[in-house]
Amino acid sequence: MPTTGRATREAGKTTRKSLLRAAAEVFAENGESASVAQICQRADAYPNQVTYYFGSKEQLFVEVAGACVLRAGRRAEEAAAGAETVREYTNTLVGTLLGPCARDVELFATAMLLVARRTDLRPLITETLTVLHERGEEALLSTLVRTGWQLRAGIDVEARAFWSAIFGLAVQKAATGADFGYRLEDAVAVVFTNLQIPDEVLDSPLRPVGPLRPVDTDTDTDTDTPSPAAQEA
């Protein structure tokens, strides 16, 4: 590849990464209502670069929200990895998702609502949910199932139910703030109510498991490829 081509590609990578980093910060601070101007100011970029790399602010938001929730899921798994019982595992998992990582979960819940009017962005949501559900299945296999507890539904169904409950609680928490009304114990009970896990399973010891399978949450793959909207312009 000519030197000028490599330089252009590297510049594209740098710009796209800067926009993603800035957008993650600005969206975390201001939510979906953050403006392109705010993002560009933080990234030292121009508005037309948002259009070139992402097509629209909405697509940028959905990409950022997807990366955020995947990182939240990974952080929750890592935080719970040292748990000695199922109860401790579930408390740590849910507590992390609705505590330190609540904003990331909330952003993705907002992104899911956004695609109701931007159906062209649904594939981004679907891909993220697929990864979350697959990782949820792995988590169930490494905890509840290996205690001998028989799930009432398929493990894929239970993994989807887990995340549906987490998203619902995150939205309630964001909407009510200090009036949320759920203690950690209450939130855990809500998330796992359909599993009907008896106390003897919750208190079952967990054997150590191997390292978590790495999952790429980087959204910087085709870094200097313009968005479909830009290509059609």
Which sequence ranges carry the predicted segments?
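Hydrophobic alpha-helical connector segments
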Residues: 63, 74-106, 151, 155-162, ...
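Short loop-to-helix capping motifs
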Residues: 56, 117-119
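Solvent-exposed, amphipathic alpha-helical segments
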Residues: 18, 22-29, 75-79, 107, ...
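Hydrophobic/aromatic-rich alpha-helical bundle segments in the mid-to-C-terminal region
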Residues: 122-123, 144-217, 228-233
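Helix-turn-helix
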Residues: 14, 18, 22, 26-59, ...
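Short, basic, alpha-helical segments at the C-terminal edge of helix-turn-helix-like DNA-binding modules
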Residues: 66-72
